[in-house]
Amino acid sequence: MYQEISQLLMYGDLDEDSILAQMGEVFGKYETGEYNKTGLVRDINTQVKRILKVATDYGFDDNLWHNYLTFFLMMSENPFSMTCEKVGASDGSVNELVENDFRIFKDLFDYDFGPIEKDLGINCFSQISNYKAIHKKDLMYNKNVSEKVRSLSKKLEAAKDEKEFFDAVTGFYKDYGVGMFGLNKAFRIDDTPQGSFTFRAINNMDTVMLDDLVGYEIQKKKLVDNTEAFVQGKKANNVLLFGDSGTGKSTSIKAIVNQYYKDGLRMIEIYKHQFKYLSEIIAEIKNRNYRFIIYMDCLLYTSDAAD
């Protein structure tokens, strides 16, 4: 496994502390025979526990090793995956390089953990390769991501070669995108101690759809027409929703995002004190192949407001 991972090119820029990189180090020791058995088992257990943590957060099931590798491919923002974002793969020499990477990933999918389990007297890889997750309520994990990971994982398991693997992964990039913006519908801004910001996905946003909103037909039509123009790259307007609390303003936005997520619509929610980041936020997202709603709620200005 160490040799396979070390030969990755487009997908080879690994964080040294990532699960995949650490698994490569573990198997490098095993494959050379330069290891202490107790220490190696401890290292393996550490990485398996990390896989279980990711599996719990995102509701993985069945083969957690396959689910993790699939999640890694979905989240990997590299020059190739970014060019495939919402458009799919184009013809070019880079495809051959990527197919080489996908041949390695197929080998990782099909990796036989039997020898290392036998030599070390462990069975953790067998356990996570045939895993039955505890049923969890939707709010306890990211269901939206879980469904996508498990679906693509099954397609990659069935891939006969690197070309089918390539088609499945790039098909996902075309349908949804790549990285956190591809997998998630909506985001908040978190302030950092360094005076900057990070994007944080909003997990399990209400699944309300426009048809669930009774009444407001004229308002809904205006929202739909404006949103459809926006996602199609046509001229669209900024929108101000106003009304008493509980009249459906926030719910309408959630419904719009749910309805047009597959068309590349995403939402970023920012608060009044975060307006100072607005130009930086736009700079971060302007080259991504999505359409972003910048959602500003509770803009409460009073006559004595200093700002």
Write out the residue ranges for each language-model feature.
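Intrinsically disordered, low-complexity N-terminal extensions of AAA+/P-loop NTPases
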Residues: 1-154
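Interdomain "pre-motor" coupling segment immediately N-terminal to P-loop NTPase/helicase cores
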Residues: 139-198
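N-terminal pre-Walker A segment at the start of P-loop NTPase domains
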Residues: 208-227
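Phosphate-binding P-loop
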Residues: 229-236
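Walker A/P-loop
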Residues: 239-265
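AAA+/P-loop NTPase substrate/partner-engagement loops
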Residues: 259-289
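Walker B catalytic acidic pair
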Residues: 297-298
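Conserved small/polar residues in nucleotide/adenosyl-binding loops
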Residues: 301-307
